[in-house]
């Protein structure tokens, strides 16, 4: 029946949708603890942590994984998805436990259990650490693969012995997903009244999270102070303007290090990528977050009818999202458009629509140059008299 006497209200479901950025600094952590009465966590089962108190209750004060959480929370109020594994009898067995896999019961173990972070807690790790264990190539390689799946950065520990050993270790990799820190740090231990050595990766992860909160995910954690340490495992020479100092030699090998300069600072912007396009960790992270935001923000657009309104709504939503990023300072500029060449009649008939999103990210000022000249140009001004 087409006749109706009265008011009709119809929902017109058109218009651009907002696109939200995902959390940039959820930390995925895997380390050792001892199950028992002092620890509520179970081996290989992810736990969501938001404070030292949570970490102590889950893993027990003094466990390796608790100390890693403490290192993170010394700098940032971070969300951590933590997976504890039991101590093994040999280094090889310990590496296998940390790497993890899938058990006979179909449960993920070790680092692989971090993949369950999103389904369990709606928290997808973006920064991965396995403090100390990542100094083993097998563990680092596993972290690289996991980081690729999660669109994350794996923060590796170096061998923590010599600069030469660190450079040699870095040459084993060529991935944009890996960010390596060497040497480790020294931390005061109140239980023993002495300094102890600790891996640097957890401290770097905390600094990444703090930088995200203070400056934005597009900012580098380099040249920012690490809290809670009393020194480094070995001295790292840093002299302003000296290309041959040890800190610069490590950076030249794409290794971040820790320098003492108005406090202890992380020093280095680069991933271990063999592709110069992805040298800066800031570019990798910006691309990851933009891509994931676009993916998550367009579930509504799947299976809608391909009309002019549909193409307009998606395009306007993308432009609004990128405009917001530009206004925040996350990107310099951008362009968004439906691709006229790819969107042929045959492609549209198959339900495929293509948009191009191009943007320029914000690189870190790794090497400001100041050209200073002394000149006699104004010397005769001393003769000027009023």
Swiss-Prot record:
Principal place where this protein is found?
A: secreted
Question: Where located?
Answer: Secreted
Carries keyword Secreted?
A: yes
Entry keywords, A to Z: Secreted
Which positions make up the signal peptide?
none
GO CC terms, sorted: extracellular region
Q: Which domain of life is it from?
A: Bacteria
Among the Pfam families in the record, one is: Phage_sheath_1C
Q: Which family does it belong to?
A: Belongs to the myoviridae tail sheath protein family.
The miscellaneous comment for this protein is: The gene for this protein is encoded in a region with many other potential prophage genes.
This protein is called Putative prophage major tail sheath protein
Q: From which lineage does this chain's organism come? A: Bacteria, Pseudomonadati, Pseudomonadota, Gammaproteobacteria, Pseudomonadales
């Amino acid at each position: 029946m087409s006749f109706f006497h009265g008011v009709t209200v119809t929902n017109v479901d058109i218009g651009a949708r907002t696109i939200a950025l995902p959390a940039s600094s959820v930390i995925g952590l895997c380390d050792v603890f001892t199950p028992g009465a002092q620890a509520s966590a179970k081996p290989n089962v992810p736990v969501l942590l938001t404070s030292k108190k949570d970490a102590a209750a889950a893993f027990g004060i003094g466990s390796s994984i608790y100390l890693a959480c403490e290192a993170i929370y010394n700098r940032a109020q971070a969300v951590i998805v933590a997976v504890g594994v039991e101590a093994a009898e040999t280094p090889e067995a310990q590496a296998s436990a940390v790497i993890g896999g899938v058990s006979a019961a179909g449960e993920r173990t070790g680092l692989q259990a971090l993949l369950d972070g999103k389904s369990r807690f709606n928290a997808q790790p973006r920064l991965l650490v396995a403090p100390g264990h990542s100094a083993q190539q097998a563990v680092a390689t596993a972290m690289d693969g996991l980081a690729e799946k999660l669109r994350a950065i794996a923060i590796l520990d170096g061998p923590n012995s010599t600069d030469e050993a660190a450079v040699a270790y870095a040459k084993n990799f060529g991935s944009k997903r890996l960010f390596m820190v060497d040497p480790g740090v020294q931390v005061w231990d109140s239980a023993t009244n002495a300094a102890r050595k600790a891996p640097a990766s957890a401290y770097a992860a905390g600094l990444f999270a703090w930088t995200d909160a203070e400056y934005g995910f597009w900012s580098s954690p380099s040249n920012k102070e690490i809290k809670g340490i009393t020194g480094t495992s070995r001295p790292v020479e840093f002299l302003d303007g000296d290309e041959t100092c040890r800190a610069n030699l490590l950076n030249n090998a794409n290794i971040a290090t820790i320098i003492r300069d108005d406090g202890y600072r992380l020093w280095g912007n680069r991933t271990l990528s063999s592709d110069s396009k992805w040298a800066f960790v800031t570019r990798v992270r910006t691309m990851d977050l933009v891509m994931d935001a676009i993916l998550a923000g367009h579930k509504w657009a799947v299976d809608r009818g391909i009309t002019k309104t549909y193409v307009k709504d998606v395009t306007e939503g993308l432009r609004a999202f990128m405009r917001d990023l530009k206004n925040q300072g996350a990107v310099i500029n951008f362009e968004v458009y439906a691709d006229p060449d790819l969107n042929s009649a045959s492609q549209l008939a198959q339900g495929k629509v293509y948009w191009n999103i191009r943007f320029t990210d914000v690189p870190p000022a790794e090497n400001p140059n100041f050209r200073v000249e002394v000149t006699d140009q104004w010397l005769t001004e001393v003769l000027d008299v009023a």
